[in-house]
């Protein structure tokens, strides 16, 4: 699965895959894996892109807004971003990004994220 995700991310970054093509791969079960709890082990190198099936949660560790610390729960961040509701499932795109010097917390979609200083890894989520 990881090799397929890396190939798709490679072509996606270069604009060689349309959203419809990615969605078709997802629907056929070729692309998305179940989401890990967080991105601690996957947030390197910067630019690494994954597609995960996630079931939203409203409680759990969440630091940042739009860009989250590597140890933030993917399920909670997805609800905070408004990509999925708690208890519902969706496929999300997760990209490892350079960590900012500071993570700003906020309240969104029934989830409160928290401020945090420097952290070694970070990611952002997007709808597919």
Describe the predicted segments one by one:
Residues 1-23:
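Membrane-proximal basic amphipathic "stem/tether" segments
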Residues 23-128:
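Mitochondrial intermembrane space
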